[in-house]
Swiss-Prot record:
It catalyses: guanosine(37) in tRNA + S-adenosyl-L-methionine = N(1)-methylguanosine(37) in tRNA + S-adenosyl-L-homocysteine + H(+). Its EC number is 2.1.1.228. It comes from the Bacteria. It is an enzyme of class 2 (transferase). GO terms for cellular component: cytosol. The lineage of its organism: Bacteria, Pseudomonadati, Pseudomonadota, Gammaproteobacteria, Alteromonadales. It is found in: Cytoplasm. The keyword Transcription does not apply. This is tRNA (guanine-N(1)-)-methyltransferase.
Length: 248
């Protein structure tokens, strides 16, 4: 997957290219990331990238010309078909369904805003989609862009090594993940659930599925609004609720 990022702070993206899952993906040629800094497209000796908003008010906006030229440079490098995304609190909220959609793209260009944002006409003429990572305010679009990159990269074939790792992540099937355990078998008087030590793969599968459904029911019940549970899942949920009521 090819990724282009428009940012005033390209150094921040070393967190993507040099470390962890995404760093290995870059090293193995599964992920290609390039950055464009609007400061490199300025024409004054101060490399000015902000400007006052019409109508007054606090704060500044990103200057149109350097930002637009940076986007055009990224588009030229990406070739035809690259989708331009602006990270914005006004955008569609990113969830696993959206991540799956974005992962189908061969190339993405991510525009990271700063200050009070960007000129609306840039959004209208240069941006294909706006995405948000949540209903809160950040200092810029870099952290949301890195969040999007990390979540999308996990779905690129070969990045995780085992596709099952991605399939078992929270939200991959619209549900929260089940609990996980490693050694030692006993920790401060708490034992690993016996079923996980049984070696019975079907029982383990059912336990994990039930725990996933049950955890979603307890912690994020609103997620069920967009789910169509199978007969098996419905039965497991009923058993989980019954067991929970008995232990309460």
């Amino acid at each position: 997957m090819w990724l282009g990022v428009i940012t005033l702070f390209p150094e921040m993206f070393r967190a993507v290219t040099d470390f962890g899952v995404t760093g290995r993906a870059v090293k193995n040629g599964l992920l290609e990331l390039h950055t464009w800094n609007p400061r490199d497209f300025t024409h004054d000796r101060h490399s000015t990238v902000d400007d006052r908003p019409y109508g007054g008010g606090p704060g500044m906006l990103m200057m149109v010309q350097p930002l637009r030229d940076a986007i055009h440079a990224a588009k030229a490098a990406a070739g035809d078909g690259a989708k331009v995304i602006y990270l914005s609190p006004q955008g569609r909220k990113l969830d696993q369904h959206g991540v799956t959609e974005l992962a189908k793209s061969d190339s993405l260009i991510l525009v990271c805003g700063r200050y009070e944002g960007v000129d609306e006409r840039i959004i209208q003429t240069e941006v294909d989609e706006e995405w948000s990572i949540g209903d809160y305010v950040l200092s810029g679009g870099e952290l949301p862009a890195m969040t999007l990159i990390d979540s999308v990269a996990r779905l690129v074939p070969g990045v995780l090594g085992k596709q099952a790792s991605a399939e078992q992540d929270s939200f991959s099937e619209g549900l929260l993940d089940c609990p996980h355990y490693t050694r030692p078998e006993q920790l401060d008087g708490m034992d690993v659930p016996a079923v996980l030590l049984s070696g019975d793969h079907e029982k383990i599968r059912l336990w994990r599925l039930q725990q996933s459904i049950g955890r979603t029911f307890l912690r994020r019940p609103e997620l069920f609004e967009n789910l169509a549970l199978t007969d098996e899942q419905t039965t497991l949920l009923a058993q989980f609720v019954n067991d929970t009521d008995k232990s309460a």
